[in-house]
A protein has these predicted regions:
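Membrane-interface soluble catalytic domains
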Residues: 1-40, 64-76, 262-272, 276, ...
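Hydrophobic alpha-helical transmembrane segments in integral membrane proteins
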Residues: 147-181
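Small-molecule pocket liners
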Residues: 237-238, 472-476
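Short beta-strand segments
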Residues: 278-280, 396-403, 425-428, 452-457, ...
Length: 573
């Protein structure tokens, strides 16, 4: 009994609680939620606890007590690590970590672990029965404490499920799938590619050093004087899908909650008769009301409910187990071991998602969309685009790729060569290869001339700053649906002062809607000294601190032309 209780505490603390808390805390960043993954870890936790208890019970005398107390102490140390020693933990954003900056906390953590592990062993040597009884009692107490916390995670989800109307979609079941990712229309197509974290300055370098990357981009215009909208991705992508910016006098939380509600952009595309596929891990609808989330999901062909009956066919159970256990070790082990378990969000999503092989050249329905450019490129080359008529007028696709975002694992040919074995320029060139392949397939299908393609980024290069000292410039390329003669011309460069605010009118014009309600299209922007707005985000390294508005006049790549307006939003309000 003693062994079972202590082993249950060890297993629960290190192998069950961390995955539950990590998934619940990640919210919309992960493709699967707590309701999908909980049985895997409940079963695994019980199995580990029972097997470990049986193994410990085979020991006799001093060996039994030493192993029992060590497991107890290890669990307590992990509990203390999470509770008190993880405040400086680097975020899981894929950026390489200089672990040398954490030497002090590594030393402190190591000392704390040594002390916590040593105390029960020393007491056990002197007072065996006291140490054993104390370990059992504290194990039970900490199981109860952590159990209450885990219960609260499930209670919030259960409350949401029972308060919705019987015929309504449970928003917790909504998943971004690949449905329609490799289909286009024979009638008309409007395609938006978003290359994450890709900057105009980087694109200028590629244009100069590797102009051959754009040989297939005939009929395109490259805009090299671009102001984006907002940074980082969690603000930039939703802007591209709504056209909404924070307003003077409103709380930033109110902006987040209403940006989809007050936008008609996606509705206008849908009402123009275009089937709509949106492929991103940063939709940003989770701040909206449930009714708005259901409405937006209903506009798309690929963002739809996946309940627990569907999840087993989509969830890689073994991959989920080991991926989230790796995350658990990163969180719970002492600092000296964290570099060996470092992870990033897209790695977790890819590890949890079952990669469904194409069947007879067609991607199976309801494969979950994850940010994996290498896998996307492979599927594009093997599956290839196909023409369907699922939209009355045509097809609209919004495809978010990693582009120049770290970690850098793609070479210039789009091949996955392993994490941090590449660099930003090589990886961006790899992304351009993917877009060139997409373009070539459209040309081979005879659909290039009736396809409008806009290529941008959610934001340009940036870092976590207390104050900004350099520009961040999204990229912008555009080709409208046009004559074969114009589509055969080489890519050209234009320096008009454009920004993300010109994306929505350009796309609405492309689907045949009234672009004037959104402003000027890219082609309508004149050569003038207009003021463009940009919204930067300051951070303390853990949380967003403030949203700061800038005016940009002249060349957007020159930070001397960026000036604060004095408008600031508290990102936590």
């Amino acid at each position: 009994v003693c062994a079972l209780i202590v082993c249950a505490f060890f297993s629960f603390t290190l192998l069950v609680v961390p995955p539950y808390e990590i998934v619940a805390g990640a919210g919309a960043d992960l493709v699967f939620g707590l309701s999908d993954i909980w049985p895997i870890f409940a079963v695994a936790g019980v199995v580990v606890a029972v097997v470990l208890a049986l193994a410990v019970s085979l020991l006799r005398g001093r060996a039994f007590d030493i192993v029992l107390l060590f497991l107890f102490a290890f669990g307590v140390a992990a509990y203390v690590q999470v509770l008190l020693l993880n405040s400086e933990l680097p975020t899981a954003d894929g950026k390489s970590v200089n672990w040398g900056d954490y030497t002090s906390i590594m030393l402190v953590s190591t000392v704390v672990w040594i002390v916590i592990v040593a105390i029960p062993l020393v007491v056990g040597h002197l007072k065996t029965s006291l140490a054993r009884g104390g370990a059992v009692a504290l194990s039970l107490a900490l199981i109860i404490v952590q159990g209450v916390g885990v219960g609260s995670l499930f209670a919030s989800g259960a409350f949401e499920a029972v308060t919705k109307e019987p015929d309504q979609v449970n928003v917790a079941d909504l998943r971004m799938t690949e449905d329609g990712l490799f289909t286009v229309s024979e009638k008309s197509n409007v395609i938006v590619f978003v290359l994450d974290f890709t900057d105009t300055k980087q694109m200028s370098q590629i244009m100069q050093e590797h102009p051959e990357e754009f040989n297939d981009w005939t009929g395109f215009t490259w805009y090299n004087n671009v102001a984006g909208s907002m940074v980082p991705t969690r603000y930039g992508v939703p802007f591209l899908l709504t056209g909404q910016l924070p307003q003077q006098g409103e709380l930033f939380s109110q902006y987040l909650a209403t940006r989809y509600e007050r936008s008609t952009y996606l509705d206008d595309i849908h009402n123009a008769g275009y089937s709509m596929g949106i492929y991103t891990d940063t939709f940003g609808t989770e701040f909206s009301s449930e009714d708005v989330q259901r409405h937006v999901a209903g506009l798309t062909m690929n963002y739809h409910p996946m309940n627990q009956e569907d999840s087993p066919s989509l969830l890689d159970q073994e991959g989920t187990l080991f991926t989230l256990w790796k995350c658990a070790m990163y969180r719970d082990l002492p600092w000296a071991f964290k570099p060996y378990f470092w992870f990033y969000t897209d790695e977790v999503n890819n590890g949890m998602t079952l990669q469904v092989e194409s069947d007879d050249g067609e991607v199976q329905q309801s494969t979950l969309y994850t940010m994996n450019d290498g896998a996307y490129y492979d599927k594009l080359k093997t599956t290839k685009l196909s023409a369907t008529d699922d939209g009355e007028t045509g097809a609209f696709r919004f495809i978010h790729l990693l582009g120049g975002h770290y970690p850098f694992n793609l070479d210039e040919n789009g091949n996955d060569i392993g994490t941090d074995n590449s660099d930003a320029i090589r990886q961006i060139r790899g992304s351009l290869k993917m877009l060139s392949e997409y373009i070539r397939q459209l040309k081979d299908m005879g659909l290039y001339d009736n396809t409008a393609i806009l290529v941008t980024s959610d934001h340009g290069d940036w870092g976590i700053y207390e104050d900004w000292d350099s520009s961040s410039n999204a990229i912008m390329f555009y080709k409208p649906a046009q004559s074969a003669e114009v589509d055969a011309q080489p890519i050209k460069t234009v320096s008009t002062p454009v920004a993300h605010v010109n994306v929505q009118p350009t796309i609405i014009q492309a689907v045949g809607g009234d672009s004037s309600k959104y402003g000027e299209t890219l082609a309508q922007v004149p050569f003038d000294n207009r003021v463009r707005k940009f919204y930067t985000t300051t951070s303390d390294g853990k949380n967003d601190v403030s949203i700061v508005e800038y005016d940009i006049t002249g060349w957007a790549t020159d930070f001397n032309n960026w000036h604060k307006t004095g408008a600031i939003w508290d990102a936590q309000q």
